[in-house]
Each structure stands twice: as C-alpha cells, then as structure tokens.
C-alpha cells in the first residue's frame, strides 16, 4: 500500500486561519457582552504583561479535596496604570445596516497632549465644533446603538517599558440606557480611569492580545508532525511531511511551513485574584526578569496569559462567563523571591 492508513487526523484548526502576523500590537475586541446593570460601566481596560510568580490561596471549590486549605496557584502580573479618556464616539446603523460612527466629542487633553501627538500627528480640537457635534448626538440620541470611549494608555508612568508613545484603543460603554451612557462618557472626557473602576477582585475577564512570535517555522514545530526516520531511503529530508497530496493543488489541511506566533488570540474567563497598589507585595528581589519593578496598580491573574513581556493586553468583560459571581479570593502568600535563576 502506498499509504499508511485510509485517513489521518487533520493538522491544525481551521478556526485559527489565516496564520499570519497580527496587523496591530494592541487589538480591539470585535464584540462586547450585553451587561444588564442599572448604571453605565466601561467594559474594558488595558494592561501590560510583567511576568509570572506564584501565590498561596484558600481553595474555594467545594468539590475539591483541598476545600478550605491552602493551594499553590501560578499567577501572571499585569501592570495597569490609569488610562486617559480622549473622546466619546456614538455608533449607529447606516444605510447598509452596518454600525458606523455618527459623531464624536473630544475632551480637553491638557498636558497629556504632548504624548498624544506622538501617535496622532496634527491633532487639533475645535471647541466650537465640539459643541456642535455634541448637539447633533443629543438630537439623534434615539438612533444611537452604543457609545465607545477612545482611550489612551500612559506608558510614561511605567519606566520598565522605555517608551512614551501611548497605545490608543476603543472601549465600549455598557449598562444603563443610552442617555445615562452619554452622561457617563461626558464626565470621563479629559480624565483618567482606574482599573478599580472597571474590574473587581474575583471577577472573570477575557484577555485579547498578540501571542509571542516565533518567526518562520517548519511543520515539525508549527504543527507537531512526527519526524521521519533518518535512513538511506528517506534521502529527501526528515523534518517534513511525507507527501503533500496530488500535484494539481495541495489540500488546505496538509501541514505547511510558515509564520508561527504573533497571532491575534483571545483567552476566555481568566480570573482576577488580586488588585493592589502595594508594589512591595509583588516586586521580587532584583525585579522581574527583562522587565524590572512594578510602579503602578497591578492585577494578579490566575494562570498564564498570552503575549510576551511588556506587551499590551486588552482586558474585556467576559462574553461567556461560566459563573455569574465568584467570591473574593483569600490570598495568604505571594512569592517575592528572586526570578533571576
């Protein structure tokens, strides 16, 4: 027989195509959850990945044999300085039935304008035009589907990043009605927003970001294909597939070498174990490897997360949570031993 068997399992997931480099370092969500809250709330935030450590906490799972006892949990540290609210955008349906921007209102940038001009060149805010745009939004409030905030990070507050150019992204407003969302967004214009205003300890969230890049890789590393034996009859190589199929076009499910990593991915239902401003509680001796010391508010997220160190990650309200409400974790110990090895 010329084949090993009648069929073989496909390699890779078609849901992750195309396996190409992400177009942006900080991707914005394609969708947001519907939040049934009486008051408006911002449905996302931005944090920077610091590194990993471990903690001890009380097990809250009643079905676990360790219920009520201390357990070892690996955590990821995300540094989350306040984000600056630049503008408020109103979205509505256009003639083609698609959501588009109906209007936007910019806030006063003040001293923060010198950082924004690094990202948006030639930005000028006309106060008269601002009042006119606000009146247009208020008059067409019934046609507004949702509001989004245009926010900017403040990397100059994080010495470890070594950059001042901010990352700009949109964050949707949820909860309340359209009028309440408009009032909520106008109050935030020109002000900063803390991570405590968005998330709470014990809450679930989704992390959207770009994975660590590995460049151009072969089928062995990219798809986990078994390496062929290295004997005299396999003279055309071992780190490759045995056959790519018929000559008239290769099937799409056949493993091929190409780009590996630096893909846009979403991790669902990551739990926040702790939100704190006490940097002495988390900074290890000698600082985090290839990062340094944490200087701002930070999150401890259960388990590992996507992305490399210093990479911005978008933190979104969970779009499909497995639990409506979880208790606040009881953290008893945080490891601050040196990570230098």
UniProtKB/Swiss-Prot annotation:
Protein name per its UniProtKB record = Large ribosomal subunit protein uL3
Q: What InterPro entries does this protein's entry cite?
A: L3_arc_euk, Ribosomal_L3_dom_3_arc_sf, Ribosomal_uL3, Ribosomal_uL3_arc, Ribosomal_uL3_CS, Transl_B-barrel_sf
User: GO: which molecular function terms?
Assistant: rRNA binding; structural constituent of ribosome
Q: Name one GO cellular component term.
A: cytosolic large ribosomal subunit
Q: Which gene encodes it?
A: rpl3
Question: Which top-rank group of organisms is this from?
Answer: Archaea
What do we know about how this protein assembles, alone or with others?
Part of the 50S ribosomal subunit. Forms a cluster with proteins L14 and L24e.
Q: Which family does it belong to?
A: Belongs to the universal ribosomal protein uL3 family.
Job of this protein: One of the primary rRNA binding proteins, it binds directly near the 3'-end of the 23S rRNA, where it nucleates assembly of the 50S subunit.
Q: Does the keyword rRNA-binding apply?
A: yes
Establish whether keyword RNA-binding is in the entry. Answer: yes
| Entries under NCBIfam families matching the protein | L3_arch, PRK04231.1
Q: What is the lineage of its organism?
A: Archaea, Thermoproteota, Thermoprotei, Sulfolobales, Sulfolobaceae
Q: Return the Pfam families for the record.
A: Ribosomal_L3
Keywords in alphabetical order: Ribonucleoprotein, Ribosomal protein, RNA-binding, rRNA-binding
Q: Where exactly are the transmembrane stretches of this chain?
A: none
């Amino acid at each position: 027989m010329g084949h090993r068997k009648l069929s073989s399992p496909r390699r890779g997931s078609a849901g992750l195509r195309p396996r190409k480099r992400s177009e942006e370092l900080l991707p914005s969500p394609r969708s947001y959850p519907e939040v049934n809250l009486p008051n408006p709330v911002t449905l996302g935030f931005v944090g920077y990945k610091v590194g990993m450590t471990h903690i001890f906490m009380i097990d809250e799972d009643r079905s676990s044999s360790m219920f009520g006892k201390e357990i070892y949990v690996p955590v990821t540290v995300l540094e989350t300085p306040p984000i600056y609210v630049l503008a408020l955008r109103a979205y509505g349906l256009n003639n083609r039935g698609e959501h588009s921007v109906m209007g936007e209102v910019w806030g006063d940038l003040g001293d923060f304008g010198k950082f924004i001009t690094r990202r948006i060149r030639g930005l000028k805010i006309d106060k008269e035009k601002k009042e006119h745009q606000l009146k247009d939004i208020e008059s067409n409030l019934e046609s507004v589907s949702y509001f989004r905030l245009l926010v900017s990070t403040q990397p100059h507050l994080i010495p470890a990043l070594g950059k001042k150019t901010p990352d700009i992204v949109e964050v949707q407003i949820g909860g309340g009605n359209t009028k309440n969302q408009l009032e909520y967004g106008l109050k935030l214009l020109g002000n900063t927003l803390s991570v405590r205003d968005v998330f709470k300890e014990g809450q679930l969230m989704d992390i959207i970001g770009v994975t660590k890049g590995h460049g151009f890789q072969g089928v062995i590393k990219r798809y986990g294909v078994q390496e062929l034996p290295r004997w005299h009859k396999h003279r055309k190589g071992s780190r490759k597939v045995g056959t790519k199929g018929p000559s008239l076009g290769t099937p799409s499910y056949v493993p091929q070498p190409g780009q590996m990593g630096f893909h846009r991915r979403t991790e669902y239902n990551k739990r926040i174990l702790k939100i704190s401003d006490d940097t002495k509680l988390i900074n290890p001796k000698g600082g985090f490897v290839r990062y340094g010391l944490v200087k701002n508010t930070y999150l401890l997220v259960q388990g590992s997360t996507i992305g490399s160190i210093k990479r911005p990650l978008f933190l979104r309200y969970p779009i499909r949570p497995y639990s409506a409400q979880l208790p606040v974790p009881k953290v008893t110990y945080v490891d601050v031993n040196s990570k230098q090895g």
